[in-house]
Amino acid sequence: MPVTVRVRRVGHRGPPLDLPRYESAGAAGLDLRADEPFTLAPGERRVVPTGLALELPPGHEGQVRPRSGLAARHGVGMVNAPGTIDADYRGEVGVILVNHGQAPVAFARGDRIAQLVIAPVVRAELELVDALSDSDRGAGGFGSTGQ
């Protein structure tokens, strides 16, 4: 069932960009666009403004995820993937990009730089205990289940 996300344009860096949209009928993410032109040098990271602030419905979050095409073609990804937008955050959405490639990558204002997935949030209640129940895996981590 669709939820309503309220969107406000912020920053005023030029003519209004299109609002994020799903690019196909089965797409999980709305494409976010850069609100200013920039060049990302090899090894450089940058917070890229989107020109948008969101009001997410209670009980939901926004997950900012990298675009696979940028990673495959240019080695550009996100430092914190996914980035989390909390329902009570009202500031401008920024995307932290990093260039893992060997060459600078230029972006124009309006280029798609990330995806925004809206997801429900389950809040946990923590219970402090003296011991945890046993499991087949136990404390094994970092490759302990095989290759």
From Swiss-Prot:
The lineage of its organism: Bacteria, Pseudomonadati, Myxococcota, Myxococcia, Myxococcales. Keywords: Hydrolase, Magnesium, Metal-binding, Nucleotide metabolism. One of its GO terms (molecular function) is magnesium ion binding. This is Deoxyuridine 5'-triphosphate nucleotidohydrolase. Disulfide bonds: none annotated. It comes from the Bacteria. Its EC number is 3.6.1.23. SUPFAM superfamilies: dUTPase-like (SSF51283). Belongs to the dUTPase family. Gene3D superfamilies: 2.70.40.10. InterPro entries: dUTPase, dUTPase-like, dUTPase-like_sf, dUTPase_trimeric. It comes from Anaeromyxobacter sp. (strain K). The keyword Coiled coil does not apply. It is an enzyme of class 3 (hydrolase). Pathway: Pyrimidine metabolism; dUMP biosynthesis; dUMP from dCTP (dUTP route): step 2/2.
